Amino acid sequence: MVRSGNKAAVVLCMDVGFTMSNSIPGIESPFEQAKKVITMFVQRQVFAENKDEIALVLFGTDGTDNPLSGGDQYQNITVHRHLMLPDFDLLEDIESKIQPGSQQADFLDALIVSMDVIQHETIGKKFEKRHIEIFTDLSSRFSKSQLDIIIHSLKKCDISLQFFLPFSLGKEDGSGDRGDGPFRLGGHGPSFPLKGITEQQKEGLEIVKMVMISLEGEDGLDEIYSFSESLRKLCVFKKIERHSIHWPCRLTIGSNLSIRIAAYKSILQERVKKTWTVVDAKTLKKEDIQKETVYCLNDDDETEVLKEDIIQGFRYGSDIVPFSKVDEEQMKYKSEGKCFSVLGFCKSSQVQRRFFMGNQVLKVFAARDDEAAAVALSSLIHALDDLDMVAIVRYAYDKRANPQVGVAFPHIKHNYECLVYVQLPFMEDLRQYMFSSLKNSKKYAPTEAQLNAVDALIDSMSLAKKDEKTDTLEDLFPTTKIPNPRFQRLFQCLLHRALHPREPLPPIQQHIWNMLNPPAEVTTKSQIPLSKIKTLFPLIEAKKKDQVTAQEIFQDNHEDGPTAKKLKTEQGGAHFSVSSLAEGSVTSVGSVNPAENFRVLVKQKKASFEEASNQLINHIEQFLDTNETPYFMKSIDCIRAFREEAIKFSEEQRFNNFLKALQEKVEIKQLNHFWEIVVQDGITLITKEEASGSSVTAEEAKKFLAPKDKPSGDTAAVFEEGGDVDDLLDMI
């Protein structure tokens, strides 16, 4: 399609002859494909908000309506729309009024009519570009008698030309279709493979090649497109065109050095130019709606107050401070005008990336045609680059604007050099948050295997691909080439609503989703690391304890007496959860929810405490053998359940023996990370204060968790050699 830039005059010349409706079953006809391409191009132009004008010429129509027709010349060619700005009316015409014809017309005659439209309808208007686009299947007969005149006129009038065909200039097997890219739209492939075209189409294709090579040499063949390729390229709305306007100013360093500069907006957050407005629901005209604002006192009569009797107020806490327009003007900062003053310099490492703010980035160049300014600014840029430093700058757009503080850092390319300015925050712009470190808790500290798995995942998801031959990096996900999906969706919905006022809005187009998905190469590479992540970070259901009702606590039981009621209250009220509803099916301690299974078994006495505890201990040892933090946490839950139930059922000695044996096994297997979690959670021996059957004091329980000092090498040697206590004292 015509390249964006200055104002252009574009003629869309579409073949609507009866052969355009022929197609292979299951594939759209060339007529429908051409219609889609034209629709997409026009809607891009409508929302691009530029000044390009578009005309529409149809050939192969049943009637004839063009200024060159006469006798049997230029028949079945219609100028459907003259040169003017594109709008929704044109889109509606393309959708509903353009229908296949029953005739055929010479595409070279249609080209001459299109040239005539451009030549006559651009008189008195200033266009930088003149362009014709022809959509045809080349099936109609044509005359080559005026071919040289056509080529000469195109060159003389500086009219560029493009052809759009249902096939492409690929290999003989048709595999060269440029529409066969990774984003090719399903069902929009070329209607005819190149090897299946007719002799008439082959002859027409040779004429098209001859014309394009005569106009632009071998590069002219690049201006012959297939419908499928065009649909892929036009599936996104064209970005709104913005022309760069330079901002002249003086870069000052101190009071004696001044450099004339011109700054351009390099990056600016884009906003939709057209805004929402209120119109009459029936006439759809803004003029039919009048808006009137009335101010009234908050009294019973709602007394009207004139606008002149109202001043604004600033709410400060619960008070309102009156602040008139005069006060507001006096409060405003009074500057001398536009400003770009260097406050000082610092190392580039001191300005961290997270401090960049604002909604624009400026590129600062020397003023045009000022050689002294160019030399001075170039010296500053190279000095900053050599010293790895940046300039801290005071920036004010004009005398009405509040000043900013920003950073200007050197930017040197092979064909230009400049300063790049980015705004920096003031104190009030910073948001300070304090978070506790995850390293403080041994419970949540990742293992080495988990860290390596996450590292592998990050490496596999890298969006930069290195080319080993050229030693360069290729960006697999260039965000600067991805259109804003918000704009795409807005334009899609506005277009649909304009053409179909009563139909519901369409779903988001699939190509928009595809643009936002990670590249297929990255997705494939990350599958293996992702599966390892799932293995090393298992999801364990965190069950929330439900509130216990009186009915659930005091349920019917054949045992009578205060002892039975007391036992039921203690056992039922302490650990009730949703899983307890399925207690009847628990016959042993399982590996999925061992702590809860253990509680159910000892509570319902389906197994002896000794048998249930042995099953629980077996699972604890299995979890520890995995040497993985998630299973360590499961073991902690089991130990905690064992301790609580042991106190209830007077089995404190059994738990204490287990915990002592566990400590020895942890030391042998060097599971220091697990024991740190035990110590951190304070899981120790059951003391006689907690259960009367225990002989462990609180001091002994505390000492049990205290870290043990490792004996020195000499001390260990004494015991190995059979030394007694006196020998040990002599060594000390």
UniProtKB/Swiss-Prot annotation:
The modification N6-acetyllysine is found at residues 144, 265, 332, 660, 665. There is a cross-link at residues 195, 532, 534, 566, 568, 669, 688 (Glycyl lysine isopeptide (Lys-Gly) (interchain with G-Cter in SUMO2)). Induction: In osteoblasts, by FGF2. Heterodimer composed of XRCC5/Ku80 and XRCC6/Ku70; heterodimerization stabilizes XRCC5 protein. Component of the core long-range non-homologous end joining (NHEJ) complex (also named DNA-PK complex) composed of PRKDC, LIG4, XRCC4, XRCC6/Ku70, XRCC5/Ku86 and NHEJ1/XLF. Additional component of the NHEJ complex includes PAXX. Following autophosphorylation, PRKDC dissociates from DNA, leading to formation of the short-range NHEJ complex, composed of LIG4, XRCC4, XRCC6/Ku70, XRCC5/Ku86 and NHEJ1/XLF. (Microbial infection) Interacts with human T-cell leukemia virus 1/HTLV-1 protein HBZ. Single-stranded DNA-dependent ATP-dependent helicase that plays a key role in DNA non-homologous end joining (NHEJ) by recruiting DNA-PK to DNA. Required for double-strand break repair and V(D)J recombination. Also has a role in chromosome translocation. The DNA helicase II complex binds preferentially to fork-like ends of double-stranded DNA in a cell cycle-dependent manner. It works in the 3'-5' direction. During NHEJ, the XRCC5-XRRC6 dimer performs the recognition step: it recognizes and binds to the broken ends of the DNA and protects them from further resection. The lineage of its organism: Eukaryota, Metazoa, Chordata, Craniata, Vertebrata. ADP-ribosylated by PARP3. Phosphorylated on serine residues. Phosphorylation by PRKDC may enhance helicase activity. Its EC number is 3.6.4.-. This is X-ray repair cross-complementing protein 5. CDD domains: KU80, vWA_ku. Residues 138-165 are annotated as: Leucine-zipper. Individuals with systemic lupus erythematosus (SLE) and related disorders produce extremely large amounts of autoantibodies to XRCC6 and XRCC5. Residues 253-452 form the Ku domain. The modification Phosphothreonine is found at residues 535, 715. The modification Phosphoserine is found at residues 255, 258, 318, 577, 579-580. One of its GO terms (biological process) is hematopoietic stem cell proliferation. Keywords: Acetylation, Activator, ADP-ribosylation, ATP-binding, Chromosome, DNA damage, DNA recombination, DNA repair, DNA-binding, Helicase, Host-virus interaction, Hydrolase, Immunity, Innate immunity, Isopeptide bond, Nucleotide-binding, Nucleus, Phosphoprotein, Ribosome biogenesis, Systemic lupus erythematosus, Transcription, Transcription regulation, Ubl conjugation. The gene is XRCC5. Belongs to the ku80 family. Gene3D superfamilies: 1.10.1600.10, 2.40.290.10, Ku, C-terminal domain, von Willebrand factor, type A domain. SMART domains: Ku78 (SM00559), VWA (SM00327).
